[in-house]
A protein has these predicted regions:
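Polytopic alpha-helical membrane-helix bundles and their juxtamembrane interface segments
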Residues: 1-225
Length: 225
């Protein structure tokens, strides 16, 4: 799936403008940050569609679906409480699964149990360590463990692509997956911390938007064989 049109620059500029407003608003504690947040991923989705030349391939449709699920998660997390948080995380999880199906379908070809068993053990250990570090407990422990494993699979799909597939675009995928994990870890830290830090909201958005952009750029430049 390659970028086919240079007209993507126009919606990309709108996306960058909205991203700047959101990040600046988060830094200053302004309400406008929440106002523009639901528009961010739709603008990125439009950029993706224009760059790809339309939604005529399954890969493009999966990529755009992941972005729109991100928009759903963004919107739900504007509200406080247990159910908006769970709904937002569920939307993001479904988006991650779209990304995993998009990238892992290529980078995991030929993997057997000799690869998957140690990989899953390592990923499980990393998730357990992060969960313990952040201090997740109670009813959210199991859901967050599942969510963490999905993030590890996303990272693994990018890492596998870097070492097994041709093209520098896989580095974009890996970087996007790592930034997504860092951003989500900050969301968990903010949620479960008794004294959230003022710098966290803006940092979440910077890393999150960079992650979404890198995953989109990687997908658009990966040549499917």
């Amino acid at each position: 799936m390659h970028a086919k049109s240079s007209f993507w620059i126009v919606p990309a500029l709108f996306f960058l403008a909205a991203a700047f407003i959101n990040i600046y608003g988060n830094m200053k504690g302004l309400a406008i940050a929440g106002t523009v947040k639901p528009a961010l991923l739709p603008l990125l989705a439009v950029t993706t569609l224009v760059a790809a030349g339309g939604a005529d391939t399954r890969d493009t449709r999966r990529l755009v679906l992941a972005q729109l699920l991100g928009c759903t998660g963004d919107t739900l997390l504007l509200f406080t409480g247990f159910y908006p948080f769970i709904g937002g995380m569920l939307a993001f999880l479904m988006g991650h699964l779209c990304y995993i199906s998009l990238f892992g379908g290529t980078s995991w070809k030929g993997f057997g149990l000799k690869t998957w068993i140690p990989a899953l053990v390592i990923m499980g250990g990393i998730v357990a360590g992060l969960i313990r570090l952040i201090g997740v407990e109670g009813d959210l422990l199991v859901p967050m463990c599942v969510y963490g494993m999905v993030l590890m699979l996303l990272i693994f799909s990018g890492l596998s692509g870097v070492f097994r597939c041709r093209g520098n675009a896989w580095w974009l995928v890996l970087a996007g997956a790592l930034l997504f994990t860092f951003s989500d870890a900050l969301i968990a830290l903010e949620t479960f911390s008794e004294e959230p830090q003022r710098w966290i909201p803006a940092t979440i958005m910077v890393t999150y938007l960079a992650a979404q952009s890198l995953l989109a750029a990687g997908a658009l430049h990966i040549k499917k064989r």
